[in-house]
């Protein structure tokens, strides 16, 4: 079956690239930051991501009968929970998919500038650039493409329901998961710059006290958003 090339343009800030390869009697879960550099192999399926939780979710979905797209979408939504610096639903990305028949599908779901954006939105009345407005303000963010991209892939090439593939992400956001060294380091690095944003400090610390390795990080608000997307699709987010 020859499938059309998909292009759904969005444009700016956070990038995730998903590459899937068609047919893949062992399953492998790989975190790209694993302590070992030993090569991993899989003959039925393999998921590689920044998060062991996300990779495990992808394998779980494929073992339950889902195809590679179902697994990738599950992985993507879990990354929104376990890898907030780059896997979040506030960003965008690209997907390159090689199907079992050899055909290739691509999807560009990068962020898009808001419809009310103008060419001088970062300038003052004298035409000078306002420092920080394009990098550290609400005007710095584009309209996220991640949710649209993942749901488009699932609707066009997946086999499972949103509820099924999003269940691992919703569970991890609500119940929480233990923080690893890398996430704790990231949180501590950005916490000082969040001082002007109390809501961000609340989300990424314990009343201003940095998290430590092994602490359980729960995100109830994110769980609510993911549940809404699961029930309503695009309309639950945009």
Regions found by a protein language model. Name each.
Residues 16-31:
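Bacterial N-terminal signal peptides
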Residues 14-17, 51:
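Hydrophobic alpha-helical segments, especially transmembrane helices
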Residues 35-56, 60, 68-238:
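Noncatalytic scaffold domains of N-terminal-nucleophile
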Residues 1-14:
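N-terminal secretory signal peptides that target proteins for export/translocation
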């Amino acid at each position: 079956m020859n499938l059309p090339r998909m292009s759904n343009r969005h444009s700016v800030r956070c990038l995730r690239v998903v590459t899937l390869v068609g047919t893949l009697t062992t399953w492998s879960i790989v975190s790209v930051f694993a302590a070992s550099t030993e090569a991993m192999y899989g003959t039925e399926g393999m998921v590689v991501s920044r998060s062991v939780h996300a990779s495990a979710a992808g394998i779980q979905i494929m073992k339950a009968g889902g195809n590679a797209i179902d697994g990738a979408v599950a992985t993507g939504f879990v990354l929104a929970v376990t890898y907030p610096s780059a896997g979040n639903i506030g960003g965008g990305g690209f997907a390159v998919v090689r199907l079992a028949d050899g055909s290739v599908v691509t999807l560009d779901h990068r962020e898009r500038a808001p419809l009310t954006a103008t060419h001088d939105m970062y300038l003052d009345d004298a035409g000078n650039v306002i420092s920080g407005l394009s990098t550290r303000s609400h005007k710095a963010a584009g309209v996220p493409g991640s949710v649209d991209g993942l749901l488009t892939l699932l609707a066009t090439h997946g086999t499972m329901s949103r509820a099924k593939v999003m269940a691992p992400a919703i569970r991890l956001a609500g119940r929480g998961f233990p923080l690893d060294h890398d996430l704790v380091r990231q949180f501590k690095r950005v916490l000082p710059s969040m001082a002007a944003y109390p809501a961000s400090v609340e989300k990424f610390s314990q009343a201003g006290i940095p998290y430590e390795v092994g602490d359980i990080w729960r995100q109830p608000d994110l769980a609510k958003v993911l549940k809404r997307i699961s029930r309503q699709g695009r309309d639950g987010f945009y």
